[in-house]
Amino acid sequence: MAQVELKQVRKTYPNGAEAIFGVDMKIDDGELIVFVGPSGCGKSTLLRMVAGLESISSGEILIGDRVINDVSPSERDVAMVFQNYALYPHMSVRGNMSYGLKNRKMDKEEIERRITDAATMLKIDQFLDRQPNQLSGGQRQRVAMGRAIVRHPQVFLFDEPLSNLDAKLRVQMRIEIKKLQRRMNVTSIYVTHDQTEAMTLADRLAVINEGQIEQMGAPMELYSNPATLFVASFIGAPQINLIPVAFDGSAIVNGDLRIGGFSDLPMGVDLKLGVRPDVMTIDPEGQVMMNVDIVEQHGGENLIYGTIDGVFSGEGEPQEVCLKGSQTLLPNPDDKLRLRFDPDAAFIFRTDTGERLK
């Protein structure tokens, strides 16, 4: 196991396009950190740079005390698990798991011991003599993980390993990955665009946007204390409600919405009020009236979508919002609900820079 450190790491392509902009990051020994962000943000590029599959334009990457910029992928002592499993179709499960170890000329007894240990841990020991095409998607992903485990690497790298699985299996596999990582205590980097997956797996999240780290921290820290508009809108399901507002010197306003108690916000600047669906409540004395459009029933909770009377989006349409309620809160479409939210639980951002002001 080892610490991983990135120092001012950049990636510039020959045409001058920059993919990664001076990333600084330290990943502690035994930590599971998740790179999360939208497609094309640079998260997989950053992972591939750690793996040695993508060159570094400038900066340094260290595993332990060793700078690995010019070290070949096979010598970095990392193991990677891919989205598409990358199994050899003509080999058995045992053959896939042992292939890399045989190439290293490892002792046969040691190879068999490692395969047996990993297969037992992953509950695939009964499949060792099967071919990949005889396995389910989840079983194949376990084999891919087993192939990484038997190497006893210093660092695990996961590149969207659950993307090809159905929803139920994704939940099951992410629990297994978390349990496995805790048991082995191996430094791990996990890439995903699925923020629910990121929140449930990570010791810490690195939210990446356009090749830069917007914010790093524990999952609930980023949910409760987002540094930017991007982080607030990306982290959290359902998504945060964002309402355009302006500051008139004493209150933030949008049509019939007026919330006082502010004195230090800029005037003449477009602002966004961010309110999480779980901090909105029904109250006859609430600040706004919601017209119910759709109710999604999720078993233990309901998500209620609608628009707010007299409050408008940036396009001039009625502002859409989402309210998270208990399973007993089940209004009908076209019902009206008066809503209250605690201003102290809301956020205010500059629209132009994304900076959080409150």
UniProtKB/Swiss-Prot annotation:
> What residues bind ATP, as annotated?
G37, P38, S39, G40, C41, G42, K43, S44
GO biological process terms, semicolon-separated: carbohydrate transport
- List the signal peptide residues: none
Class of this enzyme: translocase
CDD domains listed in its UniProt record: ABC_MalK_N
Q: Which GO terms describe its cellular component?
A: ATP-binding cassette (ABC) transporter complex, substrate-binding subunit-containing
Q: Does the keyword Kinase apply?
A: no
Short name of one Pfam family: ABC_tran
Alphabetically list the UniProt keywords: ATP-binding, Cell inner membrane, Cell membrane, Membrane, Nucleotide-binding, Sugar transport, Translocase, Transport
Domain named ABC transporter: which ranges? 4-235
InterPro entries tied to this protein: AAA+_ATPase, ABC_transporter-like_ATP-bd, ABC_transporter-like_CS, ABC_transpr_MalK-like, ABC_transpr_MalK/UgpC-like, Mo/tungstate-bd_C_term_dom, NA-bd_OB-fold, P-loop_NTPase
EC number(s) stated in the UniProt entry for this protein: 7.6.2.10
Its membrane topology is listed as: Peripheral membrane protein
Q: Where in the cell is it found?
A: Cell inner membrane
Q: Does the keyword Transmembrane helix apply?
A: no
As one GO molecular function, the record gives: ATP binding
Which reaction is this enzyme known to catalyze?
A: sn-glycerol 3-phosphate(out) + ATP + H2O = sn-glycerol 3-phosphate(in) + ADP + phosphate + H(+)
Q: Which Gene3D superfamilies match?
A: 2.40.50.100, Nucleic acid-binding proteins, P-loop containing nucleotide triphosphate hydrolases
Main location (coarse class): membrane
Q: What does this protein do?
A: Part of the ABC transporter complex UgpBAEC involved in sn-glycerol-3-phosphate (G3P) import. Responsible for energy coupling to the transport system.
State whether it acts alone or in a complex, and with which partners, per the record.
The complex is composed of two ATP-binding proteins (UgpC), two transmembrane proteins (UgpA and UgpE) and a solute-binding protein (UgpB).
The family note in this entry says: Belongs to the ABC transporter superfamily. sn-glycerol-3-phosphate importer (TC 3.A.1.1.3) family.
Protein's UniProt name: sn-glycerol-3-phosphate import ATP-binding protein UgpC
Q: What organism is this sequence from?
A: Roseobacter denitrificans (strain ATCC 33942 / OCh 114)
